[in-house]
Amino acid sequence: QELGYLGVLANYIREKRHGDHTFFNRNFHIEPTNVCVYDCKFCSYSRLIKERAEGWEMEVDGMMDIVKKYDNEAVTEVHITGGVVPKQNLEFYADFFRKCKAHRPELHIKGLTPVEYYYIFKKAKLSHYDGLKYLQSCGLDSMPGGGAEIFHPEVREQIAHDKCTAEQWLDIHEQAHKLGMHTNATMLYGHIEQFWHRVDHMERLRQLQDK
């Protein structure tokens, strides 16, 4: 009931700002790897580095093979997100974005979450802004909202203790906005969090929107 009421309020604001318009797209998903340096408590499919024999780590050519499978379909977007591994670094994704745009320029690239970017940019010794600007020049168009989970440290420390912090997650999105990129956000709820943790999460997102 509370969620439904929240949806009514959200729709009121949406209609006030955008009128009676709704956006749909046709996308496909590429998950470059299910191997991950992080050990989130809720993740049931990823494999740690020490378990990588049970997982997969794609190369750029393999990712492009997936893109090419959709050559004769009216897709509008490729959505890329997965685990975090050292070999899939800044230049790995720069190479893929370039090749993807060269092959199909009109295809919108919604790529990677702040969790991946925080790790990649730290390894590359780049600021969030400079890293995103570089990848934007390679073809990145927008950013998905995964990895937000629950922002409050009381919960985040228990379920995803080694991921980027809420502040780092929000800053990466803020830098993307400064570059003119659109982003979205998620919230993982229904586990150990309380209602006020959800409110805190959405309030932080609203504050970022207000900026």
Explain the meaning of each model-derived region.
Residues 64-83:
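Short Fe-S-cluster ligation motifs
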Residues 53-65, 90-91, 126-129, 166-167, ...:
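Glycine-rich anion/phosphate-binding loops
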Residues 16-62:
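Canonical Radical SAM [4Fe-4S] cluster-binding loop centered on the CxxxCxxC motif
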Residues 64-67, 93-98, 132, 170-173, ...:
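Generic structural signal for well-ordered alpha-helices
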Residues 1-23:
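An N-cap/entry alpha-helix motif that binds or orients negatively charged groups
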Residues 49-50, 79, 84-87, 114-121, ...:
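Conserved radical SAM core fold
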Residues 104, 137-148, 167-211:
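Conserved C-terminal portion of the radical SAM core fold
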Residues 78-103, 120-124, 193-197:
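Conserved glycine-rich "GG(E/T)P / GGGxP" loop and the immediately following alpha-helix
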